[in-house]
């Protein structure tokens, strides 16, 4: 449609923010041509203002300072790498470009990095090419949407689709093939609205050479800890441990959120009780701390909401991240965050 209206292609096609720009520009052009009629607005008063997407004019926050690392950091012998990152291919949910993810890994002297986009693997080819070109080991994963029954697509308010997010990471080429199968089947058999879904039946079938993380607050175990209690979460944990064995890891995130701190305490108890390895993560949705405002506006676009609408659950609220800690942190920042749990990085 854009090419028909303007006689040219637009740059950065399939970059989420630029796609939104092209859609908005096309809408205003159609209104100007009289295709959309509104008695209250004359077409002479319709004016499209080009957004400054490359150099965002959002309010800048105070420049971040490097966190000083405490002496317990000396107990951390390994280098930290980010294993839970979302790129712009998590459509309208993350602002990190693949180029920036790789360049930040280089800047922070990380020799590997992962992408785990929400519900799809659209960015894998580009990520693999750019990472290898820059001598960074690409770790390929996906944060899948998991439903009780991927093929069920009729629900009611009393019996909704009960989904959770699940991070799966390929160990090797065979693992990548299994993730690809899961992603394809999510779209061909499990698509419900905007959610391509898999289920435990598929996970068991395609688990070979795949690593499973317990995930963020939308993972099934953290959700059960918060909503149903430790016993229910422990029963669920046993399924993942039985299914993945040593390839199942408990993911610890520290975004300075009370509920998350409680989840971490329970996960650490599970780790000791069942001898499950833990990993530190940061659930990255944008690159720099000051990018949090732009990211929040992107979430508003996805929901059709105003930024002034408060974040939360229920009527009159919108979805959003609770603070500005979901950025691509340096090794020093992550080692400082987990200086009391060095084994989460070692």
Regions found by a protein language model. Give the residues of each.
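Acidic, Mg2+-coordinating catalytic module of metal-dependent nucleases/exonucleases
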Residues: 1-52
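Phosphodiester-processing cores and adjacent nucleic acid-binding clamps
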Residues: 48-346
């Amino acid at each position: 449609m854009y090419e028909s209206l303007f006689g040219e292609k637009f740059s950065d096609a399939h970059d989420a923010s630029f796609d939104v720009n092209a859609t908005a520009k096309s809408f205003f052009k159609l209104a100007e041509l009289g295709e959309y009629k509104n008695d209250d607005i004359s077409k002479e008063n319709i004016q499209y203002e080009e957004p400054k997407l490359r150099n965002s004019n959002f309010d800048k926050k105070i420049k971040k300072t490097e966190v000083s690392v405490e002496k317990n950091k000396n107990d951390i012998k390994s280098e930290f790498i980010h294993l839970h990152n979302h790129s712009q291919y998590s459509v309208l949910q993350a602002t990190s470009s693949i180029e920036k993810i790789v360049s930040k890994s280089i800047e922070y002297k990380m020799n590997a990095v992962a992408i785990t986009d929400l519900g799809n693997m659209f960015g894998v080819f580009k990520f693999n090419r750019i990472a290898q070109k820059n001598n960074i080991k690409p770790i390929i994963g996906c944060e899948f949407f998991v439903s009780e029954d991927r093929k069920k697509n009729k629900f009611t308010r009393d019996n909704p689709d009960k989904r959770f997010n699940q991070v799966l990471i390929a160990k090797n080429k065979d693992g990548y093939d299994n993730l690809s199968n899961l992603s394809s089947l999510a779209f061909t058999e499990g698509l419900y609205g905007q959610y391509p879904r898999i289920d435990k039946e598929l996970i068991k079938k395609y688990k070979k050479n795949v690593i499973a993380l317990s995930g963020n607050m939308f993972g099934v175990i953290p959700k059960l800890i918060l909503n149903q209690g430790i016993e229910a979460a422990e029963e669920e944990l046993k399924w993942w441990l039985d299914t993945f064995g040593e390839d199942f890891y408990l993911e610890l995130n520290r975004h300075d959120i009370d509920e998350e701190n409680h989840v971490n305490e329970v996960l650490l108890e599970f780790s000791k009780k069942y001898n499950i390895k833990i990993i530190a993560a940061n659930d990255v949705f944008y690159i720099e701390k000051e990018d949090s405002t732009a990211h929040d506006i992107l979430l508003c676009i996805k929901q059709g909401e105003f930024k002034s609408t408060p974040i939360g659950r229920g009527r009159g609220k919108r979805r959003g991240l609770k603070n500005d800690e979901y950025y691509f942190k340096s090794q020093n920042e992550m080692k400082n965050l987990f200086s009391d749990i060095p084994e989460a990085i070692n």
